[in-house]
From Swiss-Prot:
Signal peptide extent: 1
Organism: Neisseria gonorrhoeae
Main location: membrane
UniProt-recorded name of the protein: Opacity protein V28
Pfam families: Opacity
Length: 234
């Protein structure tokens, strides 16, 4: 396309749909930190969500190989979960003992930014279509927090003498887990897609990328992204 065979600097703008998989590890009852048992439920240990976000890139096309730097920000994920369970412990002589367990959790996760550098090779099938593959290394910034509280209440319900039942609170316990991290790491990914030359300088781009954001302390974060954008070569 063009007398320079497609060479030159370019800019690209994409709209991406991202599937995000977030896995957290927290202290377990049998772990080395069993004195710090976490109250965090499985719901906040294995999060699957999605987001739509813009991405911008600047690069240089060498007429087959391309290199590009890109920047993206992701949507902040947050959720809360409350559960309650009442278990009967004893029931005799018109006295009933129950254990009430309440769990309140609030969690957030935000891939604040991703600054990447990619190398891409274009396969020229004809004058219009160019499938491509590539690799990407990126510096990512992630913030996440969790507040989890587990409260147990043991109470006695007495119906002695046929009178209205009387409830007595016998024992209360409360355990809380709070964690907040801001982490920066380098991760690796792969890129694939196809470009369609609308004009010698303007290309429609449909792409896919997988990125592993690296080991973020006790968190693993992976994204699968499908994107549609336009690339303009100067």
């Amino acid at each position: 396309a063009g007398e320079d065979h497609g060479r030159g600097p370019y800019v690209q703008a994409d709209l991406a749909y991202a599937y995000e998989h977030i896995t957290h590890d927290y202290p377990e009852p049998t772990g080395t930190k069993k004195d710090k048992i976490s109250t965090v439920s499985d719901y906040f240990r294995n999060i699957r969500t999605h987001s739509i976000h813009p991405r911008v890139s600047v690069g240089y096309d060498f007429g087959g190989w391309r290199i590009a730097a890109d920047y993206a920000r992701y949507r902040k994920w947050n959720d809360n979960k409350y559960s309650v369970d009442i278990k009967e412990l004893e029931n005799k002589n018109q006295n009933k003992r129950d254990l009430k367990t309440e769990n309140q959790e609030n969690g957030t996760f935000h891939a604040v930014s991703s600054l990447g550098l990619s190398a891409v090779y274009d396969f020229k099938l004809n004058d219009k279509f160019k499938p491509y593959i590539g690799a990407r290394v990126a510096y990512g910034h992630v913030r996440h927090s969790i507040d989890s509280t587990k409260k147990t209440t043991k109470f006695l319900t007495s119906s002695y003498g046929g009178l209205n039942p009387t409830v007595y609170t016998e024992e209360n316990t409360q355990n809380a887990h709070h964690q907040s991290n801001s982490i920066r790491r380098v991760g690796l990914g792969v890129i694939a897609g196809v470009g369609f030359d609308i004009t010698p300088k303007l290309t429609l781009d449909a792409g896919y990328r997988y990125h592993n954001w690296g080991r973020l302390e006790n968190t693993r974060f992976k994204t699968h992204e499908a994107s549609l954008g336009v690339r303009y070569r100067f």
